[in-house]
């Protein structure tokens, strides 16, 4: 099992105390972990994608369905052959041999195969013979509850099912396969006792539990109690069958990411030999039930990843840090006891670059802080580790999504002030998934505003918007001046872009952030909320793990330090003003101090005309720091890219007395030193070159 890397030591954080029982990152996980995933006939890409997911999670067990209806359809045997050839040598397969559809049905389904039970035994024999040596176990369709699916009369169903399972189990054993009786519900053990009386358990090697703790209507006693009850039935029947969890999971339809993680870790600690988690990915397909009205929307959202392959929190932390990382994160997530009178500053998106820096400053000043974050951005869990190591007593971590209205309302209840950094921050992501972009940026902000309004007491809010609300600024006449663009207008060159400029939303990202921007201002005007909007330019500094889409200053530095090429979109002369994060924190604190005077207003926040840089100039500065000019490659301009944006910050300076102190060269040097010390080793220098590579 891969161990969680000691990033705390690597980043210069205080070392863990070996005497602290919470310092041990290793948690014993006795169960073998598998994943449940159903594949639609012909969808080879889905198979390949899931195999890649399993490798990332270091999982070698896969439970999947081979259905008679698919197998006997035109091209069915060929598809099953293709599926097994993809899986062979990659994973150990537990095939669920079913008469019905391969569509994963979720907990709404009773687990029963549909069709003629008389055909089932023949089908089991065909599959075992065709794929000789491909698997050691076969799972027979259980889920027996005395109802549904079979063509015989209702009063005959119980006996017919038991006889079918017994014959199929004996046939599988005759071919050298061990038998799993799947779909056993711990809350409905009368059916298991009936199968025992019919002799079915004598032909079964494993009983597979199908349970989804924590879902609505789930009368759940806990894994240990549930498993003990099943083992009692087995003991009474004289059966030596083992017990696995063959189907469990937790959906994220309501963005309950922390609950999915908690349910996953709870299942791993159950006293069984094997656990199969549902599912690798959310469902692309509508569930195929006889009674379509019984389909639950949550059944589509059990995946560790979305249907398009995006990580959810559990998936990403598991892939990057292993199971130990999940246990550590669970320990760091601290919820307030209820009821509680403890007040705190709420920072949504507080595990990110800006949020973690602000949390550190407030905690260092003796304030209580709640960080609410879904950890969707790679690397931010390191910030949580750092905060947890430095400020355990006053830090509250709520692993939640801003789209989860209930979680947001709970977090706001005891807040005395709020800083909102939760956002989908990448223009490129907004172009590929505009619905998610809108849900996070616009709907998420509305959730927060409604929670503040429901509190019926003043909770001052600082909302971080973006300069993208001003659009592409194509009407600003520019000229090339050396390695940068500058406005033809002398006034713009000296002062930058002011708040009086008309809004012009470009790109879905600009639209969603602009929508949220205007909602915050309007709630301040019409609902009486205390709130200000910061339309921010480029922020940089320690604890920034940059990507091409956000945190580009850190991204450039990291790529250069790794001797990797930097992609420059356009000609590299585009100009931005840079604001060091410590100066931004000063602005945040002043906003709360002066909230009564500035509420309902928007302010441009950035380094201003005195702290500007073009991409080409930044590359040269990085070369001076590293001793080698970065490698670059150029791509076409991206949609909605601004060739020039510099904030006019005079309005905010006059309102609060704020003034940035850190210049570009000093700030970039400080970020480089932090990255060198805490994030990356610096490779051996190449000879310095006289120009940026084109």
Residue ranges and their predicted role:
Residues 20-126, 132, 139, 145:
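N-terminal substrate-binding region of glycoside hydrolase catalytic domains
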Residues 31-37, 62-64, 93-97, 138-140, ...:
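Hydrophobic faces of well-ordered beta-strands that scaffold small-molecule active sites
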Residues 115, 255, 403, 432, ...:
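Residue-level signal for the nucleotide or nucleotide-sugar donor/cofactor binding architecture
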Residues 255-259, 276-334:
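Aromatic-rich peripheral "rim/lid" segments of glycoside hydrolase catalytic domains that contact
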Residues 333-537:
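N-terminal Rossmann-like NAD(P)+-binding domain of SDR-like oxidoreductases, especially those catalyzing
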Residues 358, 364, 400, 558-694:
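C-terminal substrate-binding subdomain of Rossmann-fold SDR/epimerase-dehydratase oxidoreductases
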């Amino acid at each position: 099992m891969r161990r969680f890397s000691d990033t705390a030591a690597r980043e210069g954080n205080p070392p863990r105390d070996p005497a602290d029982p919470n310092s041990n990152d290793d948690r014993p996980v006795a169960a073998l972990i598998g994943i449940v995933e159903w594949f639609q006939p012909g969808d080879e890409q889905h198979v390949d994608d899931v195999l890649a997911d399993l490798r990332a999670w270091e999982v070698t067990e896969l439970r999947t369905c081979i259905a008679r209806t698919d197998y006997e359809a035109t091209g069915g045997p060929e598809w099953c052959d293709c599926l097994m050839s993809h899986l062979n040598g990659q994973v150990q397969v537990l095939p669920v041999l079913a008469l019905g559809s391969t569509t994963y049905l979720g907990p709404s389904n009773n687990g029963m195969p549909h069709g003629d039970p008389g055909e089932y035994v023949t089908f089991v024999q065909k599959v075992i013979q065709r794929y000789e040596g491909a698997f050691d176990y076969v799972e027979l369709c259980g889920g027996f509850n005395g109802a549904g699916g079979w063509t015989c009369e209702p009063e005959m169903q119980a006996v017919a099912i038991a006889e079918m399972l017994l014959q199929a189990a004996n046939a599988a054993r005759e071919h050298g396969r061990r038998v799993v009786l799947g779909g056993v519900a711990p809350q409905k053990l009368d059916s298991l006792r009936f199968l025992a009386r019919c002799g079915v358990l004598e032909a079964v090697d494993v009983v597979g539990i199908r349970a989804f703790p924590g879902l609505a209507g789930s009368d759940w006693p806990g894994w240990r109690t549930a498993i003990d009850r099943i083992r009692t039935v087995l003991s009474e029947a004289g059966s030596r069958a083992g017990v696995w969890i063959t189907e469990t999971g937790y959906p994220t339809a309501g963005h309950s990411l922390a609950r999915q993680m908690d349910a996953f870790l709870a299942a791993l600690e159950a006293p069984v030999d094997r656990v199969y988690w549902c599912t690798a990915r959310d469902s692309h397909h509508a569930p195929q039930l006889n009674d379509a009205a019984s389909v639950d929307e949550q059944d589509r959202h059990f995946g560790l990843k979305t249907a398009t392959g995006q990580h959810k929190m559990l998936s990403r932390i598991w892939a990057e840090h292993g199971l130990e990382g999940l246990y550590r994160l669970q320990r760091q997530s601290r919820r307030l006891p209820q009821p509680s009178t403890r007040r705190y500053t709420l920072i949504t998106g507080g595990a990110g670059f800006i949020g973690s820096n602000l949390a550190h400053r407030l905690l260092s000043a003796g304030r209580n802080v709640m960080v609410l974050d879904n950890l969707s951005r790679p690397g931010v869990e390191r910030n949580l580790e750092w905060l947890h190591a430095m400020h355990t007593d006053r830090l509250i971590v709520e692993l939640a999504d801003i789209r989860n209205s209930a979680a947001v309302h709970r977090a706001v209840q005891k807040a005395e002030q709020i800083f909102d950094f939760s956002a989908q921050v990448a223009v490129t992501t907004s172009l590929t998934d505009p619905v998610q972009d809108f849900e996070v940026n616009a709907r998420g902000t509305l959730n927060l505003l409604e929670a503040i309004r429901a509190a019926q007491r003043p909770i001052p809010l600082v909302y971080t918007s973006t300069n993208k609300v001003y659009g592409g600024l194509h009407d600003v006449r520019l000229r090339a001046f050396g390695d940068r663009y500058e406005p033809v207008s002398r006034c713009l060159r000296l002062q930058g872009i002011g708040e009086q400029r008309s809004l012009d939303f470009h790109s879905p990202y600009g639209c969603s952030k602009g929508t949220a921007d205007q909602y915050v201002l309007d709630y301040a005007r019409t609902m009486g909320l205390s709130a200000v909007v910061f339309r921010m330019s480029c922020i940089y500094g320690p604890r920034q793990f940059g990507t091409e889409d956000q945190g580009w200053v850190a991204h450039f530095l990291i790529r250069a330090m790794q001797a990797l090429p930097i992609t420059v979109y356009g000609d590299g002369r585009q100009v931005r003003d840079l604001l060091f994060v410590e100066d931004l924190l000063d602005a945040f604190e002043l906003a709360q101090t002066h909230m009564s005077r500035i509420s309902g207003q928007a302010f441009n926040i950035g380094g201003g005309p005195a702290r500007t840089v073009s991409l080409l100039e930044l590359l040269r500065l990085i070369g001076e720091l590293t001793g080698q000019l970065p490698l670059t490659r150029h791509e076409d301009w991206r949609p909605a890219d601004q060739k020039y944006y510099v904030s006019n910050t005079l309005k905010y300076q006059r309102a609060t007395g704020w003034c940035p102190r850190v210049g570009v060269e000093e700030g970039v040097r400080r970020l480089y030193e932090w990255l060198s010390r805490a994030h990356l080793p610096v490779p051996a220098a190449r000879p310095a070159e006289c120009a940026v590579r084109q």
